[in-house]
Regions:
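Short acidic alpha-helical/loop segments enriched in Asp/Glu that coordinate divalent cations
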Residues: 182-194
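Active-site-adjacent bridging/hinge elements
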Residues: 136-153
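Post-HEXXH active-site segment of zinc metalloproteases
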Residues: 53, 69-111, 149-154
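An active-site-proximal "capping" alpha-helix that borders the catalytic cofactor pocket
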Residues: 167-180
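Low-complexity, serine/threonine/proline-enriched polar segments
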Residues: 90-141, 300-312, 319-320, 328-332, ...
Length: 446
């Protein structure tokens, strides 16, 4: 099932075209025991061995990707543009620019793999201790963007674009480690302490590896600004921020850009980013700037509710206070919930019009079944039974059945759409990966 557009693949991945998941680490030998595990209550579960911990946390990682793609405004935008590209350019056989519109979203994922630079692998083994700086660059294919530089003293170790891939992978990592922590907390005291220490060691080992910068960049940046957060607090805080950013409407992103433009020193490139945000793109820049702004927020006396303890104890309350005090201080009447509601309805209507095309039914069923419950609880607080999911491929094409599965035969779904999938894949491989953007020279006003 290997495709051009997919999440990072260590032990599994989600295919961005079909929204299918493959667990590439395991085959049919784990099917029976895993399907039994998936029916258990995660709030009381205790892992009996390393395999149980690995497979459950891996599944929570991958279904986070699926849910981000099928329940958030960003995911609905991505899939709506994908389906319009299929309808208007592939099925109609017309030479239209629908692929360029689709690539607005695709490119914001792809910039990580296209532009990341590792300059010194010998010094890139302790990234968390590195000094971080950021600067803006212009790329002829992707436009203006933010690069994060890692330094060991004066030596540049790595330069990493801040991308949508980092948001998606950080959200999945949060789910993966939070489910491990939850189950460890169900253990007896002595074993619990050992398990939590091993989980923390695994996490900070991940943070220090340059090979996993798509996973660890946001955590490193957040931990450096809020060093007092323990692991669970850090994971939940990052998840709260990412969930919020993934569900921003285009109007909200545009509104936030009016504040962000005043925070950018390099106005030549910064104004081009602001222009991009004014059309609802570059939402990953919102996350980057929010982390910096929140650091400023908690250190300013003019605000009443900027209690840093809320980041630890109730990050949703902290985010709400940050929006109501800090953002609204600079942007009057910022809260635009009605814009999100309207945008959501537009995407749902678009999917309903394409109901027989590729994965429209899958996206609609997931969104209508899962979006509400995910607005009330974190994924790691939910059992697999609570969520409507597609079944999952294992590495030998056997199928891992979800206990509350969407009524789609994934093998048949893949085979029926194989010609279409291959044509999409070919088009993406044979055309330049390009984001339609405004050149900094052409920005007249923001």
């Amino acid at each position: 099932m290997q495709r051009t557009l997919k999440t990072a693949n260590i032990n599994g991945y989600l295919d961005f075209i079909t929204n299918l998941i493959e667990i590439s680490k395991y085959n049919k030998n784990i099917k029976s025991v895993t399907e039994n595990l998936l029916t258990k209550d995660i709030q009381t579960m205790v892992f009996t061995d390393k395999f149980e911990e690995n497979i459950i946390s891996l599944i929570y990682h991958e279904i986070t990707h699926f849910l981000d793609m099928t329940t958030t405004l960003w995911g609905l935008e991505y899939n709506s543009r994908k389906l319009l590209f299929i309808k208007n350019q592939i099925l109609s056989k017309k030479k239209l620019d629908a692929i360029d519109v689709f690539k607005l979203n695709v490119s914001e994922i792809e910039i990580h793999n296209r532009l990341i630079q590792i300059y010194d692998t010998s010094q890139a083994k302790d990234l968390f201790s590195a000094n971080l700086k950021h600067h803006l660059v212009y790329d002829k294919n992707f436009g203006s963007l933010v690069m994060i530089d890692f330094f060991n003293q004066e030596n540049l170790i790595a330069s990493v674009p801040f991308s949508m891939l980092s948001l998606l992978e950080s959200n999945a990592i949060s789910s993966e480690f939070l489910i491990r922590i939850n189950c460890a907390l169900n253990e007896e005291q002595i074993k619990q302490q050992i398990s939590l220490k091993l989980i923390e060691d695994d996490f900070y080992n991940l943070l220090n590896k340059y090979e996993f910068l798509e996973y660890n960049l946001i955590f490193i940046l957040t931990k450096k600004h809020f060093p007092y957060l323990n692991l669970k607090e850090l994971l939940i805080f990052v998840k709260v921020l990412i969930d919020y950013v993934l569900n921003l409407s285009a109007m909200e992103i545009s509104s936030i850009s009016t504040l962000i433009k005043h925070t950018i020193i390099n106005q030549y490139l910064g104004n081009a980013i602001v222009k991009d945000m004014q059309r609802g793109m570059s939402r990953h820049i919102v996350l980057f700037k929010f982390i910096l702004m929140m650091y400023e927020y908690i250190h300013q006396d003019k605000f009443k509710f900027n209690n840093p303890d809320d980041i630890k104890n109730n990050p949703k309350i902290f985010l709400k206070n940050f929006i109501n005090e800090y953002i609204s201080y600079y942007i009057k009447n910022f809260e635009l919930e009605i814009a999100s509601d309207i945008e959501y309805k537009v995407y749902i209507q678009s999917l309903e019009k394409s109901i027989d095309m590729l994965d429209s039914k899958i996206i609609l069923e997931s969104c209508q079944s899962n979006r509400d419950i995910l607005s009330k609880k974190f994924l790691h607080e939910l059992n697999i039974m609570d969520i409507k999911l597609l079944n999952i491929f294992l590495n030998d094409s056997s199928i891992l059945k979800m206990p509350n599965s969407i009524n789609v035969n994934i093998e048949q779904y893949f085979e029926n759409n194989l010609d279409l999938i291959l044509e999409i894949d070919k088009l993406l491989k044979t055309t330049d990966m390009f984001k339609f953007h405004i050149h900094p020279n052409d920005v007249t006003y923001v």
